[in-house]
């Protein structure tokens, strides 16, 4: 049995062992036994191993070992690091750092069966992709929030501008309304002053006209007994108006009676708005009696005084 066949068979048995919980580890006792070492043909011409006791003629075997491909790189690395001392192969130097094997080297056969390059770990990439995705999601959310906040700020700015315009229009309308109200108030005040002044003028004119009418009536009454027909007719109209107010239920003129009978039946002592009775001229009297009566009426002072204000108002309206 050759060395390469023995090592390959032992490595395959260690890997196929179902009781082995972890990967096959390299041991000197398991890899090389005494009968296997005795099968080596070591010529003494070539000192490969650096010992005088062993004649290394392992050139051909070393070439075979270099050409041999091992499925387990750990075993190959262990064989390269082994030393043969006193005819016994020794394990490589103990290293604490190499005891902690990474998770990627637990099952090397399954990993290197499909790809001869060193394994690339997917979980860190997945974590980095998740972090990148979370970063991109956070960036998208932040951008959306910024956009929403910008939209809200623009809407608030538009609402504020609309409110300012509305308030400005209200202020302008209120100022115009106040100005119109002031102008209307001034116009009313001016009109009130004008109407008040006109009213005062009219009242003074009424007083003047009243005094003038009173003077004219006094003058007419002073000439009542002169025998003028116009004065007599005017006095007769005044008598009819006054008697109509004194006796409202009586007819002024009866259709069956003539004006002469009415004047004859009229008593001579009516008030006519005067305090003292006034003697009316009689149609049947003599001219001497008429003259005497007229002189008597002129000489009486009480005939020119009026009784009430109502009769005076009626005299004005004649």
UniProtKB/Swiss-Prot annotation:
GO annotation terms (biological process): positive regulation of aflatoxin biosynthetic process
Region of interest (Disordered), ranges: 79-100, 114-164, 247-304
One GO CC term on file: nucleus
Pfam families, per database record: bZIP_1 (PF00170)
Subcellular locations according to the entry: Nucleus
Disruption phenotype: Leads to a decrease in aflatoxin enzyme levels, down-regulation of aflatoxin accumulation, and impaired conidiospore development.
Chief localisation class: nucleus
GO molecular function: DNA binding; DNA-binding transcription factor activity
Free-text function comment from the UniProt entry: Transcription factor that acts as a key player in the regulatory circuit that integrates secondary metabolism and cellular response to oxidative stress. Regulates the genes involved in development, stress response, and secondary metabolism through direct binding to their promoters. Particularly involved in the resistance to oxidative stress in asexual conidiospores. Binds aflatoxin gene promoters carrying the cAMP-response element (CRE1) under aflatoxin-inducing conditions.
This protein's name: Basic leucine zipper (bZIP) transcription factor atfB
């Amino acid at each position: 049995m050759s060395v390469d066949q023995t090592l390959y068979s032992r490595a395959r048995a260690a890997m196929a062992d179902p009781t082995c919980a972890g990967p096959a580890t390299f041991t000197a006792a398991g890899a090389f036994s005494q009968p296997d070492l005795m099968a080596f043909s070591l010529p003494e011409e070539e000192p490969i191993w650096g010992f005088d006791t062993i004649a290394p003629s392992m050139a051909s075997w070393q070439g075979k070992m270099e050409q041999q491909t091992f499925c387990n790189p750990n075993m190959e690395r262990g064989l390269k690091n082994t030393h043969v001392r006193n005819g016994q192969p020794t394990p490589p130097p103990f290293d604490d750092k190499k005891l902690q094997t990474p998770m990627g080297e637990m099952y090397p056969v399954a990993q290197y069966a499909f790809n001869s390059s060193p394994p690339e770990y997917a979980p860190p990439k997945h974590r980095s992709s998740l972090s990148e995705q979370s970063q991109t999601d956070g960036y998208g959310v932040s951008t959306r929030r910024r956009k929403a906040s910008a939209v809200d700020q623009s809407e608030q700015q538009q609402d504020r501008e609309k409110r300012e315009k509305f308030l400005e229009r209200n202020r302008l309308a209120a100022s115009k309304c106040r100005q119109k109200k002031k102008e209307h108030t001034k116009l009313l005040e001016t009109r009130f002053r004008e109407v008040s002044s006109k009213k005062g003028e009219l009242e003074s004119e009424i007083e003047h006209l009243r005094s003038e009418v009173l003077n004219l009536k006094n003058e007419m009454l002073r000439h009542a007994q002169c025998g003028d027909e116009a004065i007599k007719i005017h006095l007769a109209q005044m008598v009819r108006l006054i008697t109509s107010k004194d006796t409202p239920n009586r007819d002024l003129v009866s259709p069956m009676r003539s004006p002469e009978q009415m004047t004859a039946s009229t008593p001579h002592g009516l008030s006519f708005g005067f305090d003292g009775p006034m003697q009316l001229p009689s149609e049947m009297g003599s001219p001497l009696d008429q003259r005497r009566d007229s002189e008597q009426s002129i000489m009486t002072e009480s005939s020119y005084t009026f009784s009430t204000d109502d009769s005076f108002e009626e005299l004005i309206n004649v």
